[in-house]
From Swiss-Prot:
It comes from Methanocaldococcus jannaschii (strain ATCC 43067 / DSM 2661 / JAL-1 / JCM 10045 / NBRC 100440). The heterodisulfide reductase is composed of three subunits; HdrA, HdrB and HdrC. [4Fe-4S] cluster 1 binds at C36, C39, C42, C89. This is CoB--CoM heterodisulfide reductase iron-sulfur subunit C 2. GO terms for molecular function: 4 iron, 4 sulfur cluster binding; CoB--CoM heterodisulfide reductase activity; glycerol-3-phosphate dehydrogenase (quinone) activity; metal ion binding. GO terms for cellular component: plasma membrane. Transmembrane segments: none annotated. Part of a complex that catalyzes the reversible reduction of CoM-S-S-CoB to the thiol-coenzymes H-S-CoM (coenzyme M) and H-S-CoB (coenzyme B).
Length: 186
C-alpha cells in the first residue's frame, strides 16, 4: 500500500470537483460524494470491475483524500456509465455523475482516453459516433428501413452544422483533431 504524503494532497480537490460538476448537474448531485463511507457496494456491483482492475470505490476515495492524480488515471475512463453503482449505493452517492465530472475535468486538462477521442473524431468526420458501414446499410434494407438513417452522417448541411458547433466549442482542440488529415493528431 502506498503512503500518502500530505504535501502531495490537494486539500481543496473534493470542493473543486463539486464546483466543476454543480454547473451542469447541480450542487446536491456532486456534493453527494461527501456521504460516501467506502462500503464497496459500487465496486462489487460494477460490470467493468469484473473484467478490469477498475475499482469505483478507489476512485471516490482518491477524490475524498485530495489525490488529484486520479485525473491522470485510466480508471475514470473504464466506467461504462451503466448506473448500477448509482442505483445500489446505500448512501445515495451519485457515483456515475461524479465520474462524468472527473472525466470533464480531466479532458479540460488534456487527459482523455484514446477510445473516447476516437469516438469523438467519428462525430467530426461522419456526423455520427457510430457511422453506418456497408453492412449496416445492407441490413437496414433487409429490415425494410431506408438505407440511410436520418442523421448528420448523410446530410452535408447537417454535418457542416455539427462541425461548426464543434469548432465554436473548441471540442476539436480538446480531442486534438487534425482537420487536414480528418483524423486525430498523433
Amino acid at each position: 500500500m502506498a503512503v500518502i504524503k500530505l504535501d502531495e494532497v490537494n486539500k481543496n480537490f473534493v470542493n473543486e470537483v463539486i464546483e466543476a460538476g454543480k454547473l451542469v448537474l447541480g450542487e446536491d448531485i456532486v456534493k453527494s460524494i461527501k456521504a460516501c463511507y467506502q462500503c464497496g457496494t459500487c465496486t462489487g456491483s460494477c460490470p467493468s470491475g469484473r473484467r478490469t482492475a477498475y475499482r469505483t470505490r478507489k476512485v471516490l476515495r482518491k477524490v475524498l483524500l485530495g489525490l488529484d492524480d486520479v485525473l491522470d488515471s485510466d480508471d475514470i475512463w473504464y466506467c461504462t456509465t451503466c448506473y448500477t453503482c448509482y442505483e445500489r449505493c446505500p448512501r445515495d452517492v451519485k457515483i456515475t455523475e461524479i465520474i462524468k465530472t472527473l472525466r470533464n475535468i480531466a479532458a479540460q486538462k488534456g487527459n482523455m482516453a484514446l477510445a473516447h477521442r476516437k469516438t469523438a473524431s467519428y462525430v467530426l468526420r461522419f456526423g455520427h459516433a457510430v457511422p453506418a458501414n456497408n453492412q449496416i446499410v445492407e441490413l437496414r434494407g433487409k429490415l425494410g428501413l431506408p438505407a440511410k438513417s436520418p442523421t448528420a452522417q448523410f446530410s452535408e448541411k447537417d454535418l457542416e452544422e455539427v462541425r461548426t458547433l464543434i469548432k465554436e466549442l473548441k471540442f476539436d482542440k480538446l480531442i486534438a483533431f487534425d482537420w487536414e488529415k480528418m483524423d486525430l493528431k498523433e
